[in-house]
Structures are given as structure tokens and as C-alpha cells.
Design a protein with these regions (language model features):
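Ser/Thr/Pro/Gly-rich low-complexity disordered regions
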Residues: 1-211
């Protein structure tokens, strides 16, 4: 007779070890400074991060990264005015899951002109006379646009600093609206006092129109 032998096979499963990464606290970054054009903002990650944590910074405008704005400090520009700005902080450390936290988004405000004088009109108040708008001494210096008015109604195509009176202006009062702009500043419009009524016939007399 034959005896059949038996073979014992022992299988050992592969041992796997899952490493659980640490999780950072998630405090909001802290930003100091005024959200006003030309101001400097400074950001810090907030408290509670483990020793040795490294941080990366990214400033965002309306939720989109601002090119090159990757330092803890940021100087506000004219492009930021009227938009929401926030700081994103990236925290990284060996053994931890990389984390992103965000400061509260805040709308950036413009600066304001410190002097906004009422414009005046120089020129000859007769049909055919040439009028010139004098914006005055704005601070800081601004760029100006103009609209001329006849009895309170805008004159078509009269949008330059100078205006030549026509027969349509006869017997009417003339005013000019000056709009001042400067990047990063709130635009301001000022209206001149109305002139006396325009007379007929060009003469050599001239007058400065003001209050």
C-alpha cells in the first residue's frame, strides 16, 4: 500500500502600516493695516501651529491670486480699489497634511482728494466768444474731464476744457462740470456757478466768471 504524505503550507499576510498624518489647527490668518489705497498690509498665520511649521503666503483679489504677491506684507495698489482682498496662508510640516487658511476678505477703499475747489469760467460772454474752464488747485494733482451746460442741459460734444459760444447760447446761462480722477482716489465732480446770460455780438471785453 502507498502512503500519501501531506504538506502544510502557512501563508502570512503582508503587514501594512497606515501612517496617520497630523492635522493643523485652522485659525484665521491675522492681517494688520488699513484696507485703503497705498497702505501696507502685514499678515501672520495665527496661533497654535506646531514648532517648525513653515508658511507660504498668497494675497488674493476677488478670490484670485495676485501675481508676485507672495510675501507676508503687501502694498495696496490702485488696482485693488473697489475689490475684495484677502490673504491665504499655506502651512506645511513633515508628518502633517498641508493646510490652507484664509483671512476675511475686505473691500479696499480709495483715498480722497484733500482740496476740491469749485471750477470757474474765463472768457467772453458773447456769441462767438471763447470760454475756458479753470478747474482750480486740486490736491493732489488730478486729471480732468469736462462737460459744458446750457441752462442746465448738457451741450452735445462740448467736452473739452474750452468752449466757443454759438447762437444757440444766446440769452442762456453757461456752466461747466469738471470731473477729477486720479488712480487710487475717489473721483469727484464739481459744477461751476452759472454765468450771466450770453449776449449777442462779439466784443473785445472779457470777464472772469466766479462766485
Amino acid at each position: 500500500s502507498a502512503t500519501l504524505g501531506t504538506t502544510t503550507v502557512t501563508k502570512t499576510s503582508d503587514e501594512t502600516t497606515d501612517t496617520v498624518k497630523g492635522i493643523f489647527p485652522t485659525p484665521r490668518p491675522v492681517v494688520t493695516g488699513d484696507y485703503v489705497f497705498s497702505s501696507k498690509l502685514s499678515g501672520t498665520p495665527g496661533l497654535g501651529f506646531p514648532e517648525g511649521t513653515s508658511f507660504g503666503y498668497q494675497w488674493q483679489r476677488d478670490g484670485k491670486n495676485i501675481a508676485g504677491a507672495t510675501a507676508a506684507e503687501y502694498d495696496l495698489t490702485a488696482s485693488d480699489v473697489g475689490h475684495d482682498l484677502r490673504l491665504r496662508v499655506r502651512a506645511s510640516l513633515a508628518g502633517y497634511t498641508t493646510d490652507y487658511t484664509y483671512a476675511k476678505a475686505v473691500e479696499v477703499q480709495p483715498l480722497h482728494f484733500t482740496a476740491t475747489p469749485e471750477p470757474t469760467i474765463d472768457g467772453i460772454l458773447r456769441v462767438g466768444g471763447r470760454l475756458t474752464s479753470v478747474p482750480g488747485d486740486w490736491q493732489p494733482t488730478a486729471a480732468f474731464t469736462y462737460v459744458w451746460y446750457r441752462n442746465g442741459k448738457a451741450i452735445k460734444a462740448a467736452t473739452k476744457a474750452g468752449y466757443t459760444l454759438t447762437s444757440s447760447d444766446l440769452g442762456k446761462a453757461i456752466t461747466v462740470r469738471v470731473r477729477a480722477t486720479l488712480p487710487g482716489y475717489q473721483a469727484v465732480s464739481r459744477l461751476s456757478p452759472p454765468s450771466v446770460k450770453v449776449q449777442s455780438g462779439l466784443t473785445s471785453a472779457s470777464a472772469k466768471l466766479s462766485d
